[in-house]
């Protein structure tokens, strides 16, 4: 299967002196908080790419998932995109979307998102003429009901 040492450190670089190291707020937190390296203003209904000035190498067979922070979600702030591929080595940016009614200010050093490391599988794709049937079939959005 996967030959991955879970005790191997993940290497990262602070690209500028404005960068702050990713941190976990508790020993069992799923994600590492990412910090803004700059000040930004995001008007209602707008989005902004927030630079962390951090670059890192993902562990083999892993990718980084940028996830929202619950406290920001309560304020109407969401994440756009959010995948860091195993072979990406550039500045990690986070797209913040302001779904709120007020302007949202991001200050240097604010926690803006969390980075969660997840295993990934690279399957070989095979085109076929049809798929095996299931009870659900092609029933999609809302088809399983609310209860």
Swiss-Prot record:
Keywords: Early protein, Hydrolase, Magnesium, Metal-binding, Nucleotide metabolism. DUTP binds at residues 68-70, 82-85, 88, 93, 95, 111. One of its GO terms (molecular function) is dUTP diphosphatase activity. Its EC number is 3.6.1.23. Gene3D superfamilies: 2.70.40.10. InterPro entries: dUTPase, dUTPase-like, dUTPase-like_sf, dUTPase_trimeric. One of its GO terms (biological process) is dUTP catabolic process. Induction: Expressed in the early phase of the viral replicative cycle. SUPFAM superfamilies: dUTPase-like. It is an enzyme of class 3 (hydrolase). Coiled coil: none annotated. Mg(2+) binds at residue 24. It comes from the Viruses. It catalyses: dUTP + H2O = dUMP + diphosphate + H(+). Its cofactor is Mg(2+). Belongs to the dUTPase family. This enzyme is involved in nucleotide metabolism: it produces dUMP, the immediate precursor of thymidine nucleotides and it decreases the intracellular concentration of dUTP so that uracil cannot be incorporated into DNA. This is Deoxyuridine 5'-triphosphate nucleotidohydrolase. It comes from Vaccinia virus (strain Western Reserve).
